[in-house]
Curated annotation (Swiss-Prot):
Keywords from the UniProt entry: Arginine metabolism, NAD, Oxidoreductase
Residues reported in the UniProt entry to bind NAD(+): 220-225
Gene: astD
Domain of life: Bacteria
EC number: 1.2.1.71
Name of the protein in its database record: N-succinylglutamate 5-semialdehyde dehydrogenase
The keyword NAD is annotated on this UniProt entry: yes
Length: 487
């Protein structure tokens, strides 16, 4: 059964689809896409259930969400294995994804109270009360790279705020979505509060364009996000939250511990096979002996990165990319950089036909006069050698994106200089730029989003403020306004 609508599982009425383990091509899930009629039924179910869910109150909603957390805890091994099978990521990494999903419950409850709770103040005009109310029915579009954690980061705060949800996962990770929704079902969520529709572009279009949606929360490619933004233009009454990745820079300046710096570069560029929106795509290293030494150590370390299937022993650092098509896309991206004058220090290789397994790549693009401003979503790092710190920052800012950026530098003064000038929503110092705290906002500027930061600030786009001035009874003021007479 592929779709979950109004508390019931349904077979899709569209065409057959399947998902496979990208490391070996094994089919691990089959189903049928949702038709426009089924999408409509899911939205109708969400609309019907939404007010009763809201009127339960926060404490009752939280109790059910905490029951979901218990389900995640009880099923974390199965969920981690399912994510690993369907995405190709190593199991050590998917275990951390499930842990983040579990942690999201407490963080979201805290964010609800701190960002969108209730506040009362006595004023001369009366009692001023600030409350927050849910938007209504929202769609959540999930990505394939974190098929559990990222949609979970929208769904949990949306439900806590009192919204109902229609969830459309990536067509590449339907099995993970099905398991997630099964755990929500076991948590006692009322029918219609969370609905699941699986499918490809047509299903997504039917949901995104549905007139009864009050909002849409999206994590994915810049191209799709920009199309959604255009589609929602002229609809100011609908909330749209977009997270669309980045062409993220990492600058190295004056670092004594080269080994530690190389480690942070590897974690920034190659974790998740480079399939994190915060991954470093561009690396800026000083010219000179120290920079030469760092590059030499980096080349050696990149060549030694272990790549393999999700369940390989000993465990690899990098698993498979999401698909063979994604792997071929990275080979093509590398070829383009080389054609522009890039020099391969470590060549990215497609390791096995029919799979998404690739080795990591490192390309020196210092001689390339105009780098393509593209998010190469895979383990391909572009190296630029620089002679001037201001030049490095200027080059780092030459992108339409603005998600994450970082600097590895022993000098705090260098960091503060960089922090004041770099344009990004996540800026790290002496830490991998793929590291972000769930207790902080997560989002970027420029083409990386639309100023709707998620993580701790997801509460902000899940509810709207309602300001009230109140009194327990109607009463006359001590003095009437000029020109008024009441007899």
């Amino acid at each position: 059964m592929t779709h979950f609508i109004k508390g019931q599982w349904h077979t899709g009425k569209g065409h057959d689809v399947a998902s496979s383990n990208p490391a070996n091509g094994e089919i691990i899930w089959r189903g049928q896409t949702a038709t426009a009629e089924q999408v409509n039924a899911a939205v109708d179910a969400a609309r019907e259930a939404q007010f009763d869910w809201f009127i339960l109150g926060f404490d009752a909603r939280l109790k059910i969400v905490e029951a979901y957390r218990s389900q995640l805890e009880a099923n974390k091994a199965e969920l981690a294995e399912t994510i690993a099978q369907e995405t190709g990521k190593p199991q050590w990494e998917t275990a951390t994804e499930v842990a983040a999903m579990i942690g999201k419950i407490g963080l979201s409850a805290s964010a609800y109270n701190k960002r969108t709770g209730t506040e009362t103040n006595d004023t001369p005009a009366g009692r001023a009360v600030l409350r927050h109310k849910p938007h209504g029915v929202v769609a959540v579009f999930g990505p394939y790279n974190f098929p559990g954690h990222l949609p979970n980061g929208h769904i949990v705060p949306a439900l806590l705020a009192g919204n109902s949800v229609v969830f459309k996962p990536s067509e590449l990770t339907p099995k993970v979505a099905e398991l997630m929704v099964t755990l929500w079902e076991k948590s006692g969520l009322p029918a219609g509060v969370l609905n699941l529709v699986q499918g490809e572009v047509d299903t997504g279009k039917a949901l995104a364009s549905h007139p009864q949606l009050d909002g849409l929360f999206f994590t994915g490619s810049s191209r799709t996000g920009h199309l959604l933004h255009q589609q929602y233009a002229g609809h100011p009454g609908k909330i749209l939250a977009l997270e669309m990745g980045g062409n993220n820079p990492l600058i190295i300046k004056g670092v004594a511990d080269i080994k530690a710096a190389v480690h942070d570069i590897l974690q920034s560029a190659y974790i998740s096979s480079g399939q994190r929106c915060t991954c470093a795509r561009r690396l800026y290293v000083e010219q000179g002996e120290q920079g030469d030494a760092l590059v030499a150590k980096l080349v050696e370390a990149v060549k030694q990165i272990k790549v393999g299937p999700w369940n390989a022993q000993p465990q690899p650092f990098m698993g498979s990319m999401i698909s063979e098509a994604a792997a071929k896309g990275m080979v093509a991206a590398q070829a383009n950089l080389l054609s522009l004058g890039g020099v391969p220090l470590v060549e990215l290789m497609h390791l096995q036909a029919g799979t998404g397994l690739v080795s990591p790549g490192l390309i020196d693009v210092t001689a390339v006069s105009e780098l393509p401003d593209e998010e190469y979503f895979g383990p391909l790092l572009q190296l630029v050698r620089y002679s001037d710190f201001d030049q490095a920052i200027k080059l780092a800012n030459q992108t339409r994106y603005g998600l994450s950026a970082g600097i590895l530098a022993d000098s705090r003064e260098d960091y503060e200089y960089f922090l004041a000038r770099i344009r990004a929503g996540i800026v790290n110092w002496n830490k991998q730029i793929t590291g972000a705290s769930g207790a902080a906002p997560f989002g970027g500027v420029g083409a990386s989003g639309n100023h709707r930061a998620s993580a701790f600030y997801a509460a902000d786009y899940c509810a709207y403020p309602v300001a009230s001035v109140e009194a327990d009874a109607v009463s006359l003021p001590a003095t009437l306004s000029p020109g008024l007479t009441l007899s």
